Amino acid sequence: MKSKTKNRTILVVEDERPLVQAIETKLEKNGFDVITARTVEQAARYLEEINNIEAIWLDHYLPGDKTGLDFVAMLKSPDSKWKKLPVFIVSNTASNNNVRSYLRLGVSKYCVKADHRLDEIVTEIADFLDNPEK
Amino acid sequence: MNEEKKIALKLEILAREKEAIRRKLVITARQLAVTAKEKESARRSLVVTARKLAVIAKEKEVARRKLVITAKQLKKMSETLENKVLARTKDLEQIRSRTEAILTSIGDGLVVVDKDGKISYINKSFEEMLGWKSGEVLGKSMVQVVPREDQNGIKVLFEERILTQVLSGQKFVADLTNPFYYIRKDKSRFPTSSIVAPVVLGGKIVGAVEVFRDITKEKEIDKAKTEFVSLASHQLRTPLSTVNWYSEMLLAGDAGEVTSNQKKYLEEIYRGNQRMVELVNTLLDVSRIEMGTFIVELKSTNIVRLVRSVVEEQKPQIDDKKITFLSSFEDNIPLMQADPKLLRMVIQNLLSNAIKYTPDKGRVEVSLFLDNKKNVILKISDTGYGIPKNQHNKIFTKLFRADNVIGKDTEGTGLGLYIAKSIVEQAKGKIWFESDENKGSTFFVVLPLRETRK
């Protein structure tokens, strides 16, 4: 486990309560400050209000009208101020079309929840943030 | 001369003249007799001729009478025949219009072509579905009038059209697994399912009949099914992820130390859940294959490296069962055009089967070699339980598991080989095996290299 002088803030957008709890615990144990949101609208509001968010953990299917894909499209639009913010899609909907759309939009990683250990995903995110150009 | 002498002389002259006349008369009489005879014979022959003529006349009369009768009969017969023909024509007309009405009213598109593939009949549904009028297409080539393309909009070549194949005497083909599309007159398209059958007359193919229908509805249902499966799998995966992550965290001591006994139980939960995840993934793969939503992404693929990494991944199982493992790879196997993810699934399935169905201390061999520089062959053999002869033909069937392994303590869904075969065939390869019960099995996969240079 890496020791950090300063904690990184990550926004976790996930609606499944037990999963949110597990993700939050694991991320905190790995030196992250965690903000959680259940919907795209809520997440967008937090982004506006909190300015030290360094990464986003995002699910695909979310309550409300908007999916993770809509959120990423907004984040990665040409005039967005969050264009460079790394986005990690952690979802169980591995439809090929969705994966492709996410990657085309420029997300940093896509992984299927059921196929990965939680600590694997957290470590990967931490590594990515440590070496962003990799 | 005296008078007496003169008279005597005159008398003598007279007598002579008389004699001459008498002679002449005798001659004439004779001549007359001859003429009379000739006349008699002529008369007789005339009588004969007259009699003959009478006979002929009689015969003629008989013949004439006969002719009159025949003519009457002929007339009668012709009348009957005419009536019959009329009736028959009416019947035929009725049958024809009935057939026409039936063909016309068939809800499916119908086209009849001659031996050159030229259209000789189309029905109303054909006109409605494709936008062509009968008059515009009769005598034209069906293959040209109605282009056919696959899912990706790639035109089916003339020689690959079922119609062409059927007309050339190849066995009747009906490929219902790969959906294709017919292009309308206005260039729009619709998914079609069609059946083509040859028309055989006197042992010769004289044409073909094609019946096709618009399967837009079926496709929509199919799509709904795909969406349902995708959604259901999403729903299944969420609780599975919860169990996964929490047992993982418990095992990692995130909620405090666990005793070794608790750890054992947690590991069972974790493993059981892991199997469930794999099962859901496999089911997803199967539904993708069946719905044709398997997206194939061809890349330059190093198959040797792929096999090595699968072997590496399954090393723990190999070691667990103390299996002797051998591998050999031919040098210079080039990069090939393949979907590495799918290819990996094939290798994984075959290798894990070999390990799973081989008892402890058995032997598993993997080799890769080239064939004619065009194909790469993957051979995986084991000294395992083998496949009973009477089940050889079922081994690639979905959900099928051979009798001899069901009883053994092995996990399996009966989906692995089904998936492997679907992938290999999709890649235009072949898969087969040789197996003897209790001696082992050898699986072969031949894949086209579709070589790419670096």
Name each model feature, range by range:
Chain A
Residues 36-55, 63, 120:
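Acidic, metal-coordinating helix/loop segments flanking the phosphotransfer/catalytic sites
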Residues 52-54, 80-86:
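His-Asp phosphorelay/catalytic-motif detector in bacterial-type signaling
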Residues 67-83:
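Short amphipathic alpha-helix used as the core "switch/output" element in two-component signaling
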Residues 14:
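Conserved acidic carboxylate
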Residues 102-109:
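As written
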Residues 1-11, 116-134:
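Non-catalytic signal-transmission and effector/linker regions of two-component phosphorelay proteins
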